[in-house]
UniProtKB/Swiss-Prot annotation:
Residues carrying N-acetylaspartate: D3
Enzyme class: hydrolase
Cellular component terms per the entry's GO annotation: cytoplasm; cytoskeleton
Compartments, record wording: Cytoplasm, Cytoskeleton
Top-rank taxon, per record: Eukaryota
Coiled coil: none
Catalytic activity: ATP + H2O = ADP + phosphate + H(+)
PTM comment, free text: Oxidation of Met-45 to form methionine sulfoxide promotes actin filament depolymerization. Methionine sulfoxide is produced stereospecifically, but it is not known whether the (S)-S-oxide or the (R)-S-oxide is produced.
Modified residues (Methionine sulfoxide): M45, M48
Tissue expr: Muscle.
Propeptide: 1-2
Keywords: Acetylation, ATP-binding, Cytoplasm, Cytoskeleton, Hydrolase, Muscle protein, Nucleotide-binding, Oxidation
Record-given protein name: Actin-5, muscle-specific
Length: 376
């Protein structure tokens, strides 16, 4: 769709990253951290044009002098003023569009509180004057992006993980499970175990370095105990990483110990089940007749499912839990980091979807509650 005139905007607001672009495109045009930064100190030099807040990459690059805040925690918007800044930045600075000229599709976490959807709707129509909007559940969009309408999605991002069983395009709310264990926790855990090695990472700025180490070097072991033995016996699993100041650090078993916490949350001092067991429990909460379809369509989605080895390990773990006769398939699309956005892009450009938008007129007549009647 080269005609960006009235094409819909698709904005996937994650706890860690905001993905935004135009419906019909195959990838988001803008991907930036969901952060708002405010100066720690008043500017010393008058007239330096220091802003009172920075969003996204600019906040990231000036992180040394700022206090960084994430307006989305565990997938759910908790700070609306900052969130408005993120949306403003998305429309005006990243996409460079006038929001009053384009319908906008927003995404939400599964089990998002009703009041939250209403507030999102209100801000779009009242602050940004959107002509039309829609709110879609993230995991459902990931499933659409994989070309399915039935399956179970494990969506794991920076702030939260969910297992969402979906049948014929509808999420089954009674069987959705939430796990407050995701990318940010793994970054914190890696910071902690690197400290045990004698490297010190403490500030928010250093946390970003550790996040980069995690994304570049970590992987999921097929057999954790065996991998630990290999790591202890030789240096074959060690990798080095150069810090911004030129210092080189070595990382060994931390490479697979970090994401192992997804399967063994006790590593983080959490009592919850691992992601494999959460998927299994989610399936077991569904009607017995659809379980077979769910086992055969396990879709991974989100940045925290990007570790090499995660699909094989999931296959192994779920096979061990499920009945022996059942066929289990894990689908891990290479673009799964952005599959929520891609699903939104597909949905918003379908001709059949055009009647689903909530228009400004409907909003003016019914108020924010309209979102519960039109988006499900």
């Amino acid at each position: 769709m080269c005609d960006d005139e009235a094409s819909a905007l698709v904005v996937d607001n994650g706890s860690g990253m905001c993905k935004a672009g135009f419906a019909g495109d195959d990838a988001p045009r803008a991907v930036f951290p969901s952060i708002v930064g405010r100066p720690r100190h008043q500017g010393v030099m008058v007239g330096m044009g220091q802003k009172d807040s920075y969003v996204g990459d600019e906040a990231q690059s000036k992180r040394g002098i700022l206090t960084l805040k994430y307006p989305i925690e565990h997938g759910i918007i908790t700070n609306w003023d900052d969130m408005e800044k993120v949306w403003h930045h998305t429309f005006y600075n990243e996409l460079r569009v006038a929001p009053e000229e384009h319908p906008v599709l927003l995404t939400e976490a599964p089990l998002n509180p009703k009041a939250n959807r209403e507030k999102m709707t209100q801000i779009m129509f009242e602050t940004f004057n959107s002509p039309a909007m829609y709110v879609a559940i993230q995991a459902v969009l990931s499933l659409y992006a994989s070309g399915r309408t039935t399956g179970i999605v494990l969506d794991s991002g920076d702030g939260v993980s969910h297992t969402v069983p979906i049948y014929e395009g509808y999420a089954l709310p009674h069987a959705i499970l939430r796990l407050d264990l995701a990318g940010r926790d793994l970054t914190d855990y890696l910071m902690k175990i690197l400290t045990e090695r004698g490297y010190s990472f403490t500030t928010t700025a250093e946390r970003e370095i550790v996040r980069d180490i995690k994304e570049k070097l970590c992987y999921v072991a097929l057999d954790f105990e065996q991998e630990m033995a290999t790591a202890a016996a030789s240096t074959s699993l060690e990798k080095s990483y150069e810090l911004p100041d030129g210092q080189v650090i070595t990382i060994g078993n931390e490479r697979f110990r970090t994401p192992e916490a997804l399967f063994q949350p006790s590593f983080l001092g959490m009592e919850s089940c691992g992601i494999h067991e959460t998927v299994y429990q989610s399936i077991m909460k569904c009607d017995v007749d659809i379980r077979k379809d769910l086992y055969a369509n396990n879709v991974l989605s989100g940045g925290t499912t990007m570790y090499p080895g995660i699909a094989d390990r999931m296959q192994k773990e779920i096979t061990a839990l499920a009945p022996s006769t059942i066929k289990i398939k894990i689908i891990a699309p290479p673009e799964r980091k952005y599959s929520v956005w891609i699903g939104g892009s597909i949905l918003a450009s379908l001709s059949t979807f055009q009647q689903m938008w909530i228009s400004k007129q409907e909003y003016d007549e019914s108020g924010p509650g309209i979102v519960h009647r039109k988006c499900f």
